[in-house]
Amino acid sequence: MTLFERSAKELQAEIKAGNLSIADLTKEAYERIAKLDGDVQAFLASNEEKATAQAAEMDKVPFEERGPLFGLPIGVKDNIVTEGLETTCASKILEGFMPIYDATVVNKLREAGMITVGKLNMDEFAMGSSNENSYYKTTKNPWNLNHVPGGSSGASAASVAAGEVPFSLGSDTGGSIRQPAAYCGVVGMKPTYGRVSRFGLVAFASSLDQIGPITRNVEDNALLLEAIAGLDPNDSTSADVEVPNYAAALTGDVKGLRIAVPKEFLGEGVGEAARQSVLAALEVLKGLGATVEEVSLPHSKYALAAYYILSSSEASSNLSRFDGIRYGFRAENVTNLMDLYKETRAQGFGDEVKRRIMLGTYSLSAGTYDAYYKKAQQARTLIKADYDKVFEDFDVIIGPTSPTPAFKIGENVDDPMTMYANDILTIPMNLAGVPAISIPCGFDNGLPLGLQIIGKYFDEATIYRVAHAFEQATEFHKQVPQMWEGK
């Protein structure tokens, strides 16, 4: 087994007792990566030399100056810029790009004393649900290497599930933290839009993107979100809302809490195993004193279409900056500027990215703007109103994270519509801007299933409270992939 089986609190206790050093933890991360990443394929870039030197220095820091995450290793998704460490967004067009500054969240990790061990694979520019859209490699699911880890933060979830690192950061535009967390049997939180700074996150869809933590348990997740959250003057969309002590919310008490279960989340298209695991989870929470009632979110049926119009429209604008002029890949053997733009983008972007750029450009064009983009914005307003109405009477909403467990690698690669439908249960929360978490709640043929808990704006604390209570009443979070054994 690995040191990373333990929680942050347990690791800090071992360090304080003198049984473990920060250098030991960093060494463990790189040894695990060396042993397992040939199979998992999670990491794109390593920070070993700097991280090892940093760990040796951090062991000298007095205990009274250390926080709960001090000295612990973390992997960072490759669309979050890291000064001096290659950031590619898993795209050919950014191959070799070396950022000259750190994202705000990376600065916050450093302030918390965490050690960035490397950059994690993803679907190119965060567009995908399987990690198969990466230009560099396809990350595998640690529970079954023939299956996908989810996307787009698939490697962020897989690296934690495999025990390569105990923490990672991902980004979530339509489910890209929660769906991989469900597929890999770990805990993934999409915070409220604006809770975490997006400064230094390479933009896909600016009104939807949000950075969040992936961990093995709820308490560690709460600690990491507290470390990265908060107002940032460099991000005009970050919210000036106080960041609470999330760990203090983990009381285990959910008596009197009101839980809404949308009938749309357990209806047609949701697999029987996913449905039954959610119903069983609701029984656990009822047994702990919560009340459960069925509700309706009637406009959820428009979410998938609205999301792909809006996100693709924003992507077509955001990705126009990648043209081969100032950084990244540049096409060769071109004779004029227009050909340079065309060839650089044609060769540098993958098929899925080009598909979404075209979809977005079409949606924003003069003849179709009202019929597509404007209508999608109206649908988004209705979806948000549905959530506002439910949250007048309920504390959280619960349903499955994904309709099914992880599918096989290659199974949906030529079927974009089926691939898009994998996010049908996570997309509405991004459109509404509300926070949501995925935690392990069961298995289907040896593959994990996720329970999604959705909360009110900026009320991640209540989500953590419910998630922690369920976690403590069950054993799902303690189960690990077979590859942990003897490694």
Swiss-Prot record:
The keyword Ligase applies. Keywords: ATP-binding, Ligase, Nucleotide-binding, Protein biosynthesis. PANTHER family: GLUTAMYL-TRNA(GLN) AMIDOTRANSFERASE SUBUNIT A (PTHR11895:SF151), TRANSAMIDASE (PTHR11895). Its EC number is 6.3.5.7. This is Glutamyl-tRNA(Gln) amidotransferase subunit A. Heterotrimer of A, B and C subunits. It catalyses: L-glutamyl-tRNA(Gln) + L-glutamine + ATP + H2O = L-glutaminyl-tRNA(Gln) + L-glutamate + ADP + phosphate + H(+). Allows the formation of correctly charged Gln-tRNA(Gln) through the transamidation of misacylated Glu-tRNA(Gln) in organisms which lack glutaminyl-tRNA synthetase. The reaction takes place in the presence of glutamine and ATP through an activated gamma-phospho-Glu-tRNA(Gln). Transmembrane segments: none annotated. One of its GO terms (molecular function) is glutaminyl-tRNA synthase (glutamine-hydrolyzing) activity. Pfam families: Amidase. GO terms for cellular component: glutamyl-tRNA(Gln) amidotransferase complex. It comes from Lysinibacillus sphaericus (strain C3-41). Belongs to the amidase family. GatA subfamily. GO terms for biological process: translation. The active site is at 77 (charge relay system), 152 (charge relay system), 176 (acyl-ester intermediate).
